[in-house]
Amino acid sequence: PLMPDYLQQIFIDSFSKDAMTGTLQRKTDRDWIDVLVRLRSELCRCPHCGKETFVRTDKAVRCIECRKIIKPQGRLEIGRMSLPVLAGVKLYKCHTSSEGNTEIENAQIFTGEIVPSKTTAGVLGIKNLTTGQWKEIKPDGTKKDGKSFRIEPGLKVEFGKPPIPGHITSTSNLPVGKIVPLD
């Protein structure tokens, strides 16, 4: 199947015989919005072929075009949402704003992106595309306001005002070691 299992499941739960006869509780608009925002958050470009595909934060997946395995370098967890750490992943207002997670329109407003370093292969960063400042909190507790941050295990980011906390959870292939600035 091309679509992620959680999208298939909400369709089954919503349109099954049990759901249609009322023996199963109906899925709410909020349930659908949560699934569609997750779907949008996991839509990425394959690092192998460049085509759009769905990337999970909890497991490696195959690109729906080239069939090569894609494993994100980690997860960016923001509230109840989890985004794959992969170049090109977009952050939306529904992720980074306190007013953002109740309206479906806010899943269309870009606020940031995971980008590759211009100078160091394999190093990724979070780029702030808003006019406001985001705060980086390094694993050693050092805090800094800025527009871009190098992704590393244990990195925390406060998005916007009031701050929405986010943090990086690493997977086994997240680059570690020497800290290289994101240019």
Regions found by a protein language model. Give the residues of each.
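Short, charged beta-strand/loop "edge" motif centered at a coil->beta-strand transition
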Residues: L86-K118
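Asparagine-centered strand-capping/turn motif at beta-strand->loop junctions
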Residues: I126-T130
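Short cysteine-rich clusters marking metal-coordination/redox-active sites
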Residues: C46-C49, V61-C66
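Short Cys/His-rich micro-motifs in 6-15 aa windows
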Residues: C66-R75
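Disulfide-bonded cysteine-rich modules in secreted/extracellular proteins
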Residues: E42-E52, L76-R80
